[in-house]
Amino acid sequence: MTTDHSGPPPSPGTEAWAERSRSQAEAFDIIGERYDEAFPHKEGQEQHTRRLIELLPAGSHVLDLGSGTGLPTARQLVRAGARVRGHEISPHMIELARTHVPEAEFVRADIMDLDPDERRYDAVVAFFSLLCLPRAQIPTALGLIRAALVPGGVLCLSMVEAEADDVPIPFVGARVRVTGYGRAELRTVVEEAGLVVEDERVVSYEPGEGAPPETQVFLTCRRSA
């Protein structure tokens, strides 16, 4: 995957950004249940969540950014005793998540709408959600996430390793825009946002039919006190 777009990505707060968000949401509405069919085995994601659970006391407040269908992450966290709030742009994904994990709270919200003054979290998980943003907005998103964490709070994130910036690709029957980094550059971007990377894992992943093989990078990060 290489960088290839026809012009600079739009900025949040503009009509072009709103249209981009609508287009992304519509794409994930189309994908719906097929997401879990295309990515049936999420061992790396599940293992990363288990490591997070080991770091948190029961009853911790956790924000799931890009919560999708609620599986497997929100369900894992709820079963471990966490209080989970999910942010998701796709109304259909939210419906599925509320069915799969009724104990969690799911709301329609863009990552860039995150308000650190509204609520603070012991942990934030962002599995493959930041890749839906242009590179220009990812440092801002990481800054919002850091501000939404309590001092010492944990961020678990993952991205697909790729050199890409807001590239449109066919994805499980829809078309979405995605971004990627090499693992070293991703780590640098995260650290420059004021987060300390405590653990890095790289997973070679073979999705289900209709999606190409990929290399996934998982980072466990912490907001310093």
Named regions from a protein language model:
Residues 2-58, 163:
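Conserved class I S-adenosyl-L-methionine
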Residues 63, 69-113:
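Class I SAM-dependent methyltransferase SAM/SAH-binding core
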Residues 114-124:
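A short acidic, Gly/Pro-enriched loop at the edge of an enzyme's catalytic core
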Residues 139-151:
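A short glycine-rich, Lys/Arg-flanked "PGG" loop and its adjoining helix->strand segment in the class I
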Residues 152-159:
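Conserved beta-strand signature within the Rossmann-like core of class I S-adenosyl-L-methionine
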Residues 160-177:
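Short, glycine-/aromatic-enriched active-site segment of Class I SAM-dependent methyltransferases
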Residues 178-194:
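Short alpha-helix
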Residues 206-225:
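Core SAM-dependent methyltransferase catalytic element
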